[in-house]
Amino acid sequence: MKTVHFIRHGETEQNAQKVWQGHTDTPLNKKGIEQAKLLSERISSRGTNVYTSDLKRASQTASFLSSSPVLRDNLREINVGDFTGMSVKDTYTSNHEIFQSLQNDSFQFPNGESVKEFKDRVRKELEYIFNQTEEDSETVVVTHGFFIGTAIGLTLGFNTYPFPIGDITNTSISTIVKRETVTQVNKFNDSIHLSKESIDFPAKSKDNVITFIRHGQTDSNLEGIWQGHIDNPLNETGIKEASLLKGLFKNYNLYISSPYKRANQTLSLITENNIEISDELTEMNLGQWEGLTTSEILNKYQKNFIEALFINHKTKYGIDGESIHEAGKRVENLISDLEKKKLLMASHGGTIKSAITNLIKSPDSKAASAFTIPNNLGVSCLVPKDNKYFLWSYNVGKIGYENISYNK
């Protein structure tokens, strides 16, 4: 597996003023420099290869991660042409018809880049970066918000703007992994190096937020066993790590947990609020995979394993278990009865992956493989708007892919 971490540059004065920068060569402001320092403490050891856009705000951020980052102009932000230096809000308001045209690949920013040119540039650069990344190694790429959003959207299977994702935070980490020909989103918009409070940052500013947290570690997780409906409790590590999150999740209307011990125990450790139980949040029914390691599953059910996890989201896990599509629909049914509320829900890796895939309407061609399973205690946030769900973060927390047996 190859891993690439995409990082948005630190803040600039233009970011603070909310104006379009495009290809303008702007430096970091004081806050941006502090953000880059905090980022370096978290990720500087993650990869020997660091690539960066050649624009100053990105290369300056990259300089905190490597003494010799590789500069690439193909990693630049989209060229917004005549909009450069203009207020983002004002241009959206006065050019509504123009931005509606972003759905068309032939649209071109006035004296700037076309949608098709930019998407092609992002695709080619993704291919280049992964080709330069060795198997079982990590690469760090410092680039820009629109570039990262496009890379994530394309990986999730979308092709037409606007993609169902939220605003990307300065110095946030978004990770894409590649197994042979399959690319998956492992992490999106993670900036907890700036503040622990940002673990569920959309909940701090949005009226309606759906936040998922995967349960803490169990012995089965540690041993690489697919536990599904087996009702395991947290192990010592799971209890310790969940306890560290106490008090961070505030101002939710409802706290809901799967009935299984590992999920309910996790939510009880991070909040003192009343917890409701919902069977709709149980882990996926793994059918004949239940209680087996990945190696054992591959020995007995290799074709079913590959098809269910990477090819067809309607294929049942373990022959007679549950599909990604079915698990996602049951969570959607739960949420539809709880509209206009802030929800914090403790659930399981397969169910969270399935729910988010379904809620953002990942295209069928990528619905099985859009996301990796989130890590233990990984936090993901969705924001509903205009009868749609927008992904604002995924698998916020630890960097790297914990599911070692699954990875092998």
Q: Could you tell me what each predicted segment is?
A:
Residues K2, I7-L71, E113-V115, K119, ...:
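Active-site-proximal alpha-helix that buttresses catalytic centers in soluble enzyme cores
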Residues K2, R72, I78-D90, N131, ...:
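Acidic, low-complexity terminal tails and accessory targeting/binding regions
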Residues T12, F147-I148, T218, T351-I352:
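Short active-site segment of divalent metal-dependent hydrolases/proteases
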Residues G22, K30, E34-K37, E41, ...:
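Extended, hydrophobic interaction surfaces within ordered domains
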Residues F64, T150-L154, L269, S354-N358:
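Active-site signature of alpha/beta-hydrolase-fold catalytic machinery across serine-
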Residues L65-K124, K187-N189, P233, I270-R330, ...:
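Phosphate-handling substructures
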Residues L126-F130, R330-S336:
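A short, acidic, amphipathic alpha-helical segment used as a generic capping/interface helix at domain edges
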Residues T143, I213, A346-S347:
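A conserved hydrophobic position in a structured secondary element of the catalytic/binding core
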